[in-house]
Amino acid sequence: MQVQPEKLSIWDVVHAVDLAITTFIIYVLTTSITPLLTHHPAQPVGILWAVISAVFVFRDTREHSLSAGMSRLLATCVSFTLCLVYLLLFPANPFGMAILIAIGTLLMTLAGRRDEIGLFAITTAVVLIVAAENPQTAWQQPFLRLADTVAGVTVGITCKWIASFLFFRLSGQEAR
C-alpha cells in the first residue's frame, strides 16, 4: 500500500506553528512558575510532562482538543488518587506499580473509560518511577504530575482555541 503525500494548506502551516509556539510557551511557563511555587528549580520530568500534556491535547479541531484534555485529566486524576494513597503507605517499587496499573485498569474499565487506560498506565508508571528515585519526597510526585498535566492541558487547549479562532475569523471560514 503506497501512501500519497498530502498537500499542505495554510491552515496546516498555522497549526504547525501554533504547536511549536505552544510547546515554547509551556516550557517557559513551567521553568518560570515552578520555582516560584516550589522554591526549587523546575525538574526535567516536570517540564517534559507539561510539554507532553500540551502536545497530547493539540488535535485537529477545538472539540477534539477539549475531548483529549478531558481524557488526559481524567486519567491523571485516577492515577493521582491511586498513587498518592499508595505512596503514603508504601515505598515506590515495580511490584507496586504493576498492582496500581492493574487496579486502575479495572477501575477505568468499570467506569466505561477504556480509551483512557493507556494514559492512566503511563501516568502511573511515570509517577512511581520518579518517586522511587527520591523516597523522602515520593508522596509529592502525584501532586507535581497533576500540576504539570493541568498546566500542559490548559496551555495546549488555550493555544489551539486561540489560533483556530483567529485563523478562521481572518479567513472567513468556520472555526474547527
Regions from the PLM with identified roles:
Residues 1-122, 126-176:
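Alpha-helical transmembrane segments and their membrane-interface boundaries
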